[in-house]
Structure formats: structure tokens, C-alpha cells
Amino acid sequence: MAKTIMIIDDDQVFHDLYTEMLEDTDYRLIHVYDGDEALLKLEEEKPDLFILDMLMDMMTGDTVLLYLKSMPECEEIPIIVISGQPKQRYKSLKEVDPNLIFLDKTVTNEKLIQEIKARIG
């Protein structure tokens, strides 16, 4: 069965980009556009990995991350944060999840796939 990745980003352009980057993989993608939608979708299905944007209008990425890590059913699910902001801005989130991975919005296909495979195969 294909591993599932939930993409949480309020920008359709990045959803399209990640879909294109991962189109030659066997991963199944779930697209949600804000934190509230992500939390609702989690009632239906649990992904194997999250790709999370930090700068979103409705609920910021760090708030979403804190919610996810406070949920027993999600606390072990890996999160890859992809942001255009400097990593240092979110350094304190490593205390919540020491395995958190930060990637720049300009991440290459190869790097993104490498990081995903390292976490969920």
C-alpha cells in the first residue's frame, strides 16, 4: 500500500509544485490548505508524513505543528517543514520534535524525495 503524505500549505502553487516533484513516486498525496482543514482531514485518515508550510493565513505552521504533536495519534508522524523563512526562526520547534526537518522552499526534487524516503521509505 502506498505511503500517504499530507501537504499543509495555503498556496496552490506549492501544492502543484510538490505534486509535480513527487509524481514519479508511489506516494499518495492529501492536499489541505490550512491547519483547520488538516485537523478535520485527520478525523478521516492518518498520513505517514506531513509536509508543512510555516507562513499561512488562517493558522500558522508552528501552531499546526504544536496541535499535531499534542495528538497521540500524530505524535510519531514525521514532519518536514518547508519554508522560505530562515531555519533559525523556528529553532525552538526542535524542542517539540527533535526529528523535525527544515527545508527551504527552493528544495530540489532529489532532496525532498531523499528526506521523505529517509523517514517513511
Where are these regions (language model features)?
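Two-component/phosphorelay signaling modules centered on CheY-like receiver
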Residues: 12-30, 100
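Active-site beta3 strand of CheY-like receiver
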Residues: 45-51
